[in-house]
């Protein structure tokens, strides 16, 4: 099995699970925060939505410059899902054409051109999948705090038993 096939297998589980959680994000709760220092629910949901696109860029070797990233502007759950589906498709399509050698090349995270971090694409992609799962977990807590039933992610939830 190739490196790309391993990642595709992981995304084939994680991306549909993520989408089921995003489906539960209520459009009217976008500005809600559990604490003044926390991100808004809409911001967090949009971050989760954008990460599959970052995954595709990592594999293609397109560095991320945080200063050039578009601002977070939560619109609606429908927009979130449309954006997520498009980005998930790109990630899968890029992985389908990737060669093992692509994953040994480097990728960098920048801010205004200054390199913040550099790593092998294989390592960075794995970390980005972990980052997605981490923020998906945060999002599930935000939803729970708003009494929104949670879907099954790794096993049944109290809402689905």
Model-derived features with residue positions:
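Short low-complexity stretches enriched in small and charged residues
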Residues: 1-3, 47, 108
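Short coil/turn linker and secondary-structure boundary residues
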Residues: 2, 39, 72-75, 98, ...
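Soluble or luminal CAZymes and related metallo-dependent hydrolases
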Residues: 3, 10-14, 83-87
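Active-site rim elements
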Residues: 3-8, 76-81, 125-129
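Short, contiguous alpha-helical
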Residues: 8-22, 27-70, 110-161
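Helix-adjacent hinge/juxtasegments
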Residues: 57-99
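Acidic catalytic patch
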Residues: 97-114
């Amino acid at each position: 099995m190739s490196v790309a096939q391993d990642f595709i297998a992981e995304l084939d589980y994680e991306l549909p699970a993520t989408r089921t959680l995003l489906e539960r994000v209520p459009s009217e709760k976008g500005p809600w925060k559990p604490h003044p220092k926390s991100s808004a629910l809409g911001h967090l949901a949009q971050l989760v939505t954008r990460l599959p696109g970052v995954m595709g860029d990592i594999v293609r070797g397109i560095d991320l410059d945080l200063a050039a990233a578009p601002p977070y502007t939560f619109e609606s759950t429908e927009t979130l899902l449309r954006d997520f589906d498009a980005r998930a498709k790109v990630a899968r399509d890029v992985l389908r054409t990737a060669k093992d050698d692509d994953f040994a090349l480097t990728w960098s995270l920048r801010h205004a051109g200054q390199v913040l971090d550099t790593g092998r694409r294989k390592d960075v992609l794995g970390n980005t999948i972990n980052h997605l799962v981490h923020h998906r977990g945060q999002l599930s807590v935000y939803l729970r705090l708003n009494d929104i039933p949670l879907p099954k992610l790794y096993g049944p939830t109290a809402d689905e038993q």
